[in-house]
């Protein structure tokens, strides 16, 4: 376990015990954020001067990975909350940060990243889904965010990139569930991770002003936060792969010992990629070279699938018996989510192919 997690709270067993219930949506989804906050996990990688425990963004990646080893649903929620916190840390709007950061760090309130659409917009994959019409110093917002996680029913704040009707540079705003014109849908009918408070947001004639603006220039802000957005997300892949490989090694006895060299090879490559994430964040390489992070994301997703396959092979028929190994069945469907989380593997592969084509032209 990461040293910073050990220093905060070593008792993460609650997430293991409740993993199946949250995956199936059979537990109170609103309890996840307070449980994560109670253990001080949202403070990891946040400057002490702002109420955090210090450290770097990579410490947050490792914290999410530690939770993902126990429950991908909890890690998914953790990613949404911690990523919104990162937006506040990088926003020039100090009043917005001062208002919301304390409650987000403690887990009293939920933060959600609605910037998946913006990240795809940066790559020319899709247009922005919210539109702002200016009225004096304020704007009127309309549109829909079809898939957002950590929309806690007890209350949430969500970041979104907004196209301006006058053609000015898109901006990034923060909306709350209590604002008139902001409506949360019922939970999406997910195959797994059903306790993640994942839903759509409809926005109709919602009034916002300067107090809601995270950044006036989405084209400047989003590339700057993208390394944290993606790297924190990679914590889910890292944690899921680690627990699958560790289980494969534990079960790799007798006739299954033939798998151990392959388990070792995949584990070594996994940790090499983890080191590349750490170094890329520290050097800020991913700001100037996002393609390097895209390639890591793609390879980590492939490693998750390999790790789960090795766990299955090492466990044998036991993996297919619910009364003997429920964790594997849960991890198998959790793993199916890794390739499709935004930006999906096909979207990243398309972006890399487009960049390669541009270089050849």
Language-model features and meaning:
Residues 147-182:
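A short core secondary-structure module
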């Amino acid at each position: 376990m990461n040293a910073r997690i050990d220093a905060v709270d070593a008792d993460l067993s609650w997430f293991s015990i409740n993993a199946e219930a949250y995956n199936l949506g059979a537990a109170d989804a609103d309890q996840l954020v307070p449980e994560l906050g109670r253990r001080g996990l949202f403070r990891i990688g946040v400057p002490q001067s702002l109420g955090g425990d210090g450290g770097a963004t990579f410490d947050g990646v490792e914290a999410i990975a530690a939770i993902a080893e126990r429950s991908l649903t909890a890690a998914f929620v953790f990613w949404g909350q911690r990523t919104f916190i990162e937006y506040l840390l990088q926003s020039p709007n100090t009043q917005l940060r001062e208002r919301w950061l304390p409650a987000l760090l403690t887990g009293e309130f939920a933060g959600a990243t609605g910037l998946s659409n913006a990240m795809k917009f940066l790559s020319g994959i899709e247009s922005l889904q919210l539109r702002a019409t200016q009225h004096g110093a304020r704007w009127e917002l309309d549109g829909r965010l079809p898939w957002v996680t950590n929309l806690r029913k007890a209350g949430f704040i969500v970041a979104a990139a907004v196209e301006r009707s006058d053609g000015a540079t898109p901006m990034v705003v923060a909306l709350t569930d209590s604002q008139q014109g902001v409506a949360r849908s019922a939970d999406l009918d997910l195959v797994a991770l059903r306790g993640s408070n994942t839903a759509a947001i409809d926005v109709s004639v919602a009034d916002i002003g300067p107090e809601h603006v995270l950044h006036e220039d989405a084209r400047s802000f989003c590339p700057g936060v993208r390394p944290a957005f993606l790297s924190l997300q990679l914590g889910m892949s890292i944690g899921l792969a680690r627990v699958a490989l560790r289980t494969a090694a534990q079960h790799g006895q007798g006739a299954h010992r033939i798998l151990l060299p392959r388990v070792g090879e995949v584990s070594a490559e996994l940790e090499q990629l983890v080191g590349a994430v750490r170094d890329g964040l520290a050097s800020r390489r991913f700001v100037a070279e996002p393609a390097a992070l895209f390639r890591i994301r793609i390879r980590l997703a492939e490693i998750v699938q390999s790790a789960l396959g090795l766990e299955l092979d090492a466990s044998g028929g036991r993996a297919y018996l619910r009364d003997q190994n429920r964790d594997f069945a849960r991890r198998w469907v959790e793993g199916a989510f890794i390739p499709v989380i935004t930006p999906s593997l096909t979207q990243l592969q398309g972006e890399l192919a487009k960049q390669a084509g541009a270089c050849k032209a």
